[in-house]
Amino acid sequence: MSEMQTKEYPAAPWRLNGQLYGSIWSLSPGNIRVELPLDFKLLVNLGRASAFAGFVDYQPGSTLVYHELIGGVVVRLQDSWRCAFYVTHIWVDDAQSQQGGCEIWGVPKELATFRYNYAPPARTFTAAAQVSNGQVLARGHFRTTMGLPRPLKLPVPFPNLQMLHGQPHHSSGTFWSSLQLCRGGTVVPADSPLAALGIAGHKPVVSFAGLNFKMYLAAAKPVKSHK
């Protein structure tokens, strides 16, 4: 198969913009049932670990336009204090994004279908994602309550660690958005793969929106030896 046939996705960096709605949980480490690579350890502070799950709407002006459901945990590199977000589950509705995400950043993208609905007067966003057999992966209901003035955007670092080609890789994007606190959040059914994060049936500590975000995401790079 030719190079053109095997790499049908845009080269990094990807320039992304759109809307993000997500929730963060603080959990007992024993609730989290995902298997981490040997190079990574769950980051535990005061007996608690952190998990995230949320919906993203990559809108026109992005390298690719698609929807996404993403979940993961905060980890640290073995024998190091380097910490980052580790993507354990991720679904998109674009084949180019799926292939590019797997091959450029090592994230385990799969395909799903999405329903998004915005209700601007009430500042409400609802969403659902499901796979081809009809299984619901997650639902979301967010209503913004307070936050930065909409025109004001603050930078938030977004470090990521993943395994790629059998070794740890890192990527780091800066996420510029108007951050808003939300009522509601991401809801995960007990039979969803995301339930392995320990978040099904648990209330998040915070739900938020990153409105009108912009992000520049360079290709993942191998982590230099830390031993």
Positions of predicted regions on the chain:
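Aromatic- and glycine-enriched beta-alpha-beta binding-site module
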Residues: G54-N133
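Interaction-surface and assembly-scaffold signal
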Residues: S2-M4, Q99-K227
